[in-house]
Amino acid sequence: MNNYANYAYYQDTYKGAVLDAASFDVYARQATVYLKLQTSNRVDDNSIPDEVKMCCCDISELTYKADKARHSGAASEKVGSYSVSYESNADIDKKLMSESYTSLIAWLGTTGLLYRGL
């Protein structure tokens, strides 16, 4: 399975700067699987629309940031009168799903790829 976007597209067109090439490949694969599920696999792999590629890049970054948050532990930290709060993995996952769906609707909402009817 090929990813819907490659690293060159991520850098040059999406203008992404968060992920390196190796990380992008991992997260773009996860984003591609999510997009295939949400579009009922209607994207033609031989002619991938820019909206799909942009959405793939966007969701790749969102997934990376969620993974980073899972491993950092602290959601916020205060130095004066030291205070730390933690975000649960469930909250991080819920936020990722919400942000991914928002990206999906923003990029693909007018393409017909999300249509669930006959």
List PLM regions with ranges:
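Divalent metal-cofactor coordination and adjacent catalytic microenvironments
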Residues: M1-L118
